């Protein structure tokens, strides 16, 4: 649902070139490929993720629409003012230097281009936040152990979400980078947030 929302936001701006940063297994990139006359570029620092992503893209015959390569969000291998839209789904939490990553995103976007970020966040309302923290600290690790081959990933999700910047802090960082018209959309009672900002 959120991936479709990202695509709908992107579609409003009639993009010709979109970069999906931290593309993972290309779920967002594949969704974005439904936009007509638009080329999708996906990068991820993980060679394993890119390999899986390429297999998925190939199996859906989307090679003509989507280009995938290994790449670092904090050192993008693209020229200035190249993309109309830049998307990042559950990726900025893993940036080593968020400021540097946002500056790189800003650099490769065309003037009046948009950045669309989807990221986990802590709910703002105290009551919901307490319930969320109890759930994430107790149940997420249990779910990870019971249903996943990689329970450490679930534990990391919980810990990294708690340590990550607040929604207000991310907005400030976007503004400090130079982005304007910053909008936030709260999802799952604040457990995830979509950020939309214009260069």
Where are these regions (language model features)?
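A short acidic, Gly/Pro-enriched loop at the edge of an enzyme's catalytic core
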Residues: 74-86
């Amino acid at each position: 649902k959120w991936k479709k929302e990202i695509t709908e936001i992107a579609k409003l701006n009639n993009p010709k070139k979109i970069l999906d940063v931290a593309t993972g297994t290309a779920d967002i990139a594949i969704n974005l490929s439904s936009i007509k006359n638009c080329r999708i570029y996906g990068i991820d620092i993980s060679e394993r993720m890119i390999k899986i992503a390429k297999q998925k893209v190939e199996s859906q015959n989307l090679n003509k629409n989507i280009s995938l390569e290994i790449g670092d969000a904090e050192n993008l291998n693209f020229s200035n003012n190249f993309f109309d839209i830049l998307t990042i789904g559950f990726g900025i939490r893993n940036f080593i230097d968020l400021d540097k990553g946002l500056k790189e995103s800003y650099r490769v976007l065309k003037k009046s281009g948009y950045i669309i970020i989807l990221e986990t966040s802590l709910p703002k309302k105290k009551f919901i936040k307490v319930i969320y923290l109890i759930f994430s600290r107790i149940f997420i690790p249990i779910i990870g152990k019971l249903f996943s081959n990689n329970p450490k990933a679930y534990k990391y999700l919980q810990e990294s979400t708690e340590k990550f910047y607040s929604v207000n802090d991310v907005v400030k960082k976007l503004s400090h980078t130079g982005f304007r018209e910053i909008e936030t959309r709260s999802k799952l009672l604040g457990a995830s947030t979509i950020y939309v900002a214009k260069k």
